[in-house]
Amino acid sequence: MRHQKSGRKFSRTSAHREAMFKNMAASLFKHELIKTTLPKAKELRRVAEPLITLAKVDSVANRRLAFARLRDNEAVGNLFTILGPRYANRPGGYLRLLKCGFRAGDNAPMAYVELVDRPVVAEEVAE
């Protein structure tokens, strides 16, 4: 029985799942807004939020821990230079999930994952 087992499988192997969430977290830290399915968005919080908490204290050891989890230098740089200082006084809850309808092909529920307190870009205001 599968009682008390946390985390979703998404019909993927553990390596595929781990790689998918590394890539999604790296994209989130680069662009600060991504669109994905709602279950993936909910599961992404478990990966991304601890990394932002880690980035609050900028040290070589923390950068190495973050790089081990993300494997992306640009994302780690953004995490420690931009996001860590931005959320230094926030005790958690760095991500916001916004439901945005259903995907055309398979009617999967979709959601935007964005970082709270992110600067609004002029292009997005025009939309």
Swiss-Prot record:
PROSITE patterns: RIBOSOMAL_L17. It holds the Pfam family Ribosomal_L17. Coiled coil: none annotated. The keyword Ligase does not apply. Transmembrane segments: none annotated. InterPro entries: Ribosomal_bL17, Ribosomal_bL17_CS, Ribosomal_bL17_sf. One of its GO terms (cellular component) is cytosolic large ribosomal subunit. The keyword Ribosomal protein applies. Keywords: Ribonucleoprotein, Ribosomal protein. It comes from the Bacteria. One of its GO terms (biological process) is translation. GO terms for molecular function: structural constituent of ribosome. Part of the 50S ribosomal subunit. Contacts protein L32. Belongs to the bacterial ribosomal protein bL17 family. NCBIfam families: L17 (TIGR00059). This is Large ribosomal subunit protein bL17. It comes from Stenotrophomonas maltophilia (strain K279a).
